[in-house]
A protein has these predicted regions:
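Positively charged n-region of N-terminal signal peptides that target proteins for export
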Residues: 1-6
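Hydrophobic core
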Residues: 8-12
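C-terminal segment of classical bacterial N-terminal signal peptides
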Residues: 13-19
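Exported/periplasmic cell-wall-interacting domains
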Residues: 21-49, 54-59, 139, 179-183, ...
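SH3/SH3-like beta-barrel superfamily modules
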Residues: 23-41, 84-130, 328-339
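SH3/SH3-like (including bacterial SH3b) beta-barrel domains
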Residues: 74-87, 310-319
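Short, structured interface segments
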Residues: 106, 117-137, 265, 269-283
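Gly/Pro-biased beta-strand-loop elements
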Residues: 118, 123-229
Length: 363
């Protein structure tokens, strides 16, 4: 299963110093750089470090965007295949460069339903010819982080964490194990635009990051009266639901960000980096400090909010009333839900349940 290989990472490597939470790192080796996706704990406790990871160059396999190359168990074309990597967009972690013209790399396998292999999303190590590898520069205005544990996208701009968006990543099942979203580091490589899914839903503003896996807006079905119906997909934001693509909220955050905003800003920013953190045992989400401000509108809104203004609330009610995160436990606020526009932190009980779900397996 996908999480087994990542659990080995947890046992082999401890997180870097300075992180409040003992979260695992994606990779199993070192690359000799100060900032490296594969060696950085999977959490947001140090946004500056995450930003520096997002702007680093990335090693890719040369080739066409929709082609996979096989990794071999030994440095030989006749060896067993152990995984696959997508050309042009998927980053690999170079562990060793051999004198015989081969390199040992690791990545999350990008096998799909058309592949010869059924290694779906596992962290794998394998060999490929060194001449196939190329280091690519990364655009440095924006950076994106998708966390499969929280089902959130964290949008960075010019060194700062700008906003948080609700997403739905791929949902792998026993019948369709290829439908999970492959973790790793990627470059956005092409603007695809709108397309119709196999179920007949329209997906807008699609951007390619890993072969057939795209960033795109919440799918909608067109009703007979011409109205766009988002309800069947929008209600699943915040949980796994897609067939590999990453669905991104259409409702604007207080900063005005949604999938359309990303499409417009990233149109001339190909090779912006996207990193995807896998939801593996051993990961934890921090509980916000009790004095963290949140905002409410008693009697008029049944949600709590992250900012004093929100697109879910009419401007005549701005600014909303400020309370503390700790006060959400009081009876007056106990039934308020998390706003789907501005995405405030989950309640304590929800975070604790999430952490319990991904608690490391003990001996």
């Amino acid at each position: 299963m996908r999480w087994i290989a990542a659990l080995l990472v947890l046992m082999l490597l401890m997180p870097a110093a300075g992180y409040a939470q003992e979260n695992p790192v994606p990779g199993t080796g070192t690359c000799g750089r100060e900032y490296c996706y594969w060696e950085t704990p999977m959490d947001l406790s140090d946004p500056e470090t995450i930003w520096n990871v997002l702007i680093q160059p990335m090693t890719v396999v040369k080739g066409k965007q929709r082609v996979q190359v096989q990794l071999m168990a030994q440095p030989s074309e006749d060896a067993e295949m152990v995984g696959e990597v997508t050309c042009d967009s998927q980053g690999v972690h170079v562990l060793e460069t051999l004198e015989n013209g081969w390199s040992l790399v690791e990545c999350y396998s990008s096998s799909n339903k058309l592949s010869k292999l059924d290694v779906y999303g596992d962290l794998v190590k394998g060999y490929l010819p060194t001449e196939m590898l190329e280091e690519r520069e990364t655009k440095t205005r924006y950076g994106l982080v998708v966390d499969e544990m929280t089902q959130r996208m964290y949008v960075f701009e010019k060194g700062r964490l700008l906003t948080t968006l609700r997403v739905s990543t791929g949902k792998a099942t026993q019948k369709a194990p290829q439908c999970g979203t492959t973790a790793g580091e990627f470059h956005l490589v092409s603007m695809v635009g709108n397309f119709i899914s196999e179920s007949g839903a329209t997906c807008e503003h699609a951007i390619r990051f890993n072969d057939g896996d795209l960033l795109h807006g919440v799918p909608y079905y067109l009703e007979d009266n011409g109205k766009k119906n988002y309800s069947s997909c929008e209600r699943h934001l915040g949980e796994k639901a897609s067939e590999g693509c990453i669905r991104i909220q259409r409702k604007r955050t207080p900063e005005g960000v949604n999938m359309r905003w990303l499409w417009e800003r990233l149109f001339d920013q190909m090779h912006t980096k996207l990193i995807i953190w896998q939801d593996v045992p051993g990961r934890r989400q921090p509980i916000p400090a009790e004095d963290t401000p949140v905002y409410v509108l008693p009697g008029l809104s049944n949600a709590y909010h992250s900012k004093p203004t929100c697109y879910d609330i009419d401007k005549i009610y701005f600014p909303m009333e400020e309370i503390t995160y700790g006060q959400l436990e009081e009876e007056a606020y106990a039934r308020l839900h998390n706003c789907g526009y501005c995405n405030p932190p989950l309640r304590v009980q929800e975070i604790e349940a999430l952490n319990q779900r991904y608690a490391a397996v003990e001996e």
